[in-house]
Amino acid sequence: MNFSMEVCGMYVPFRASLLPFGGEHIFPKEENLRLFLENNKTIGIYAYPVEQIAAEHLLPIVKQLELLQDMEHYQKLYEILSKYPLEGRKVQESLGALCRKDHVKCSALVWESLSGYGTYTYMEKKWKSLLRKVKKKEPAWQEVHGLICRFLEPIWEKLMEDQIFFGDWMPQLGRFLD
């Protein structure tokens, strides 16, 4: 939805998205935004945790593998991993719950398949098709796939071993801090 608001006699456009949420037992957290043009007045907004959103994009990726038709899951996940710090434990808990609910087995075979897609021309063609659709030229498929694999590998290993993962994702570094 596109909105505009008037601040100091100027109209400021902004966009808000409302996405359906299919998860359970997830509560929005409050975030405060500072309005610089309004004497640093703050407003509160409620948003679902970015860890849950990341897990919801990971589920179709690990469930459907190369049969995934909607490459937007890769795009959205790449955007999240590039911008937001994440708590690995929360992503692991959310992804584990979603996998159990959808009967997705956390196995080495799934990881081997997924990790090999960096050089898989079929997936690269699907990625380039998405980029044309959204009128972008980058990032390259190998960059997107590499970032997602660096993020998912330690989480997936702990899911397979039924252990808890402790690590904080740092988007500036493109890796976890353990």
Report residues per predicted region.
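Structured mid-to-C-terminal alpha-helical surface segments
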Residues: 1-178
